[in-house]
């Protein structure tokens, strides 16, 4: 399994879903980047940083909203290590983007060796095994051959395909129960058992919480990262997780601003 040893306070945030229609969320994220650079020893972003990512070549002529976000990440990465994960919306994030930002690609899943101990980190969509239609889609778009064929298309073609896929996904999700789109308990237990860890951190489900469970007679924890929306949600929402020698603590974006 991929391993990553990091010391000091680690900040984690996911599911920002940044795009041209999320200026307030982007502004909040830029604030998080500055705060993390001041207070954290590393920042980890395990997936769905962007609402869509059609290939790293978009940075060569980035629209203003994206240029501002990339500038913020680059500035933070100049002060602390920044790790970019890939989610179900931005699975095409690649080495070109990481190199341009002075950041690192976050392997998935990854076993973090922290001051608090060993922690399993991943985006989380792989645990939603009850949603068979989504798992088929995930297997397709993670296939290197499919990715190569997609990236060979023009940017306008890729944008149109991404917009169509997003619309189909939203329509399909409206017909699915929340339980189907959540993680499967057996898949979570299997991951904890295989990694031999007591703590799992993931995003994806937009259901922030700390779950305590027992696996093989051991107390385990599953921490779910919050999603961000400061543009369309009322009240705005977002947050991040801090891992240090004392444990794990989740901070709410709105409460922190008050």
Curated annotation (Swiss-Prot):
It catalyses: UDP-2-N,3-O-bis[(3R)-3-hydroxytetradecanoyl]-alpha-D-glucosamine + H2O = 2-N,3-O-bis[(3R)-3-hydroxytetradecanoyl]-alpha-D-glucosaminyl 1-phosphate + UMP + 2 H(+). Pfam families: Metallophos. It is found in: Cell inner membrane. The keyword rRNA-binding does not apply. Its main location: membrane. It is a peripheral membrane protein. Mn(2+) 2 binds at residues 48, 88, 123, 204. Pathway: Glycolipid biosynthesis; lipid IV(A) biosynthesis; lipid IV(A) from (3R)-3-hydroxytetradecanoyl-[acyl-carrier-protein] and UDP-N-acetyl-alpha-D-glucosamine: step 4/6. Gene3D superfamilies: 3.60.21.10. Coiled coil: none annotated. Belongs to the LpxH family. This is UDP-2,3-diacylglucosamine hydrolase. It comes from Bordetella pertussis (strain Tohama I / ATCC BAA-589 / NCTC 13251). The lineage of its organism: Bacteria, Pseudomonadati, Pseudomonadota, Betaproteobacteria, Burkholderiales. The gene is lpxH.
